[in-house]
């Protein structure tokens, strides 16, 4: 894919990162300004707020209130309790720059007469006379206003209203009805609001199944029963292996791991099952309440207990004793429950709050605006986009309000997080809201469309500096990478204690339990899947709900699925790392070939310096690193890293490779497509197999030096070792090293090129176990 474009970005073409100068902090900002006021990372947006509190002495019982200015109109919910003194407690926010009139009207209407010309009463406010209120000023007290009829005559009934000009810093901003989403009505209005979510605290539940005794089989004459344990926690099922002890007293000594969520209201159910052919028959169950399970914070043994196993009849009655099971159950709070990909994690703290250290800083994010968004759907015969942002860091998720029907939405919302480790990543995703115009049941089945995602690693940011950049929003689709627009962000990472932050670089990344009692890769993968499932359920219960599709996209679920594109990208990263070593080897080879006699002579002199003055050699190397690091300070990166399509190989991936990457697991393909992909994977795996075999061969040749597998080679090596011992006893080590270095770098006149050296010839003749491979 050809990518062209211009700009002052750090990437190529339209996918570049651009530095911006937004009007934040009561004026423009330049990269290093340190603004400190509240909401100083966003542009101030002024709103006309109208808070409808209550009404009294209305001449009708079922009423609602409409608030309008110009063509914008919002309305409260209808009060259907036949009450002439209704309570509303709703707030309306009109963007001041888009006001289409000078008079704000608050109109009380009767539910039974929805006619626009038929009103119960109203009151008017001149916009020019409305006061301005900016936090931390106290909220304006609401006042009672007499209602007027259409002719301006005072009538019976009053309404309590508070009206003011404010900004997005107002406390009611997130709960208010906004004029930029006026086309959304009814129960869908809640899906346009901003929201702060907190992830539940998750713990690992460890169930060490030791043994069972006196199990009662359903078939008393059965010989060699195959007993296993099934664990149920919520919707999660974990199976043990079949016990190797084929009796009614089986032994396992196996760990079963679950993810449990506070406040531990659930119960763990263990089912003892006998595998009879393809079926598994339940011999009995045991229920353990999580609230009664011991919580383990530090490494140490947990006492084991015996639990009764009860068999329950098909009707749920007739419980009877079916044996005993020996368990060691604990809630392990010393682990960090991984719900994100480890390389993009935003938190590494243990589950137990007792193990938390004080925060080392504060992260502030200003979500300013987006520009040039692509049409995501069609409404009214034209393309449109209803965009909102979601940001996740640690256990705190934030969601901006939805800006309806615009390709250039302005949010200007600011959020803060406490930082406990600088080696963490904040993730910002942009989505198109598809839950604004459907019915409630329909909305639950709709997935919001992805517009793009940004990751920013805090350790790459200079503390107290404001970064204002426009990030490209990219989505990889089966037909290639596509730019969906740009989002402008302002980010600042402030350290509360520089010493505490520097100390973090000396501490383990994960809590101690991950190293003292490590979990297997399989367990971590299964537990991460469980944690993601719990978060999806928990965040989906809020209003507005964060859908499973949004949560999984933010948590990077599916990142471990095979992708040829990512495999090529990682291979090139590895090659890039070795490029420096390869260049150094080529340079040394040129020294040995004396292509530049002056350089070769200088290297010989340096070699003598290293051999005879090793102390100064180490000193020189450290000094060189120090000076070179200072020199590189002027060339340091000025921008935070961003998604690179060239590094990701997204611009050169073939359609079939992308189609394979987006295929479900297990694959939905069949026939020739699946055969072609399988053959391609076999070719890649075959090359990897050869490389691994070559590495194993070299290692086995080293081991064979003393194995006497080749008696002549071992004899030669032992003779060499014995002679070398004698030489070292009588010849100075410095002279030996000098001779060895000069021999390696000897002049071409005393060297035969293109012929392997004696050590190489000897090493290649050593045996390996490759001869034993079938």
From Swiss-Prot:
The lineage of its organism: Eukaryota, Viridiplantae, Streptophyta, Embryophyta, Tracheophyta. Belongs to the MCTP family. GO terms for cellular component: endoplasmic reticulum membrane. InterPro entries: C2_dom, C2_domain_sf, C2B_MCTP_PRT_plant, C2C_MCTP_PRT_plant, C2D_MCTP_PRT_plant, MCTP_C, QUIRKY-like. Residues 1-12 have a biased composition (Gly residues). This is Multiple C2 domain and transmembrane region protein 11. Signal peptide: none annotated. Residues 9-145, 184-307, 338-471 form the C2 domain. Ca(2+) 1 binds at residues 62, 110, 112. Its cofactor is Ca(2+).
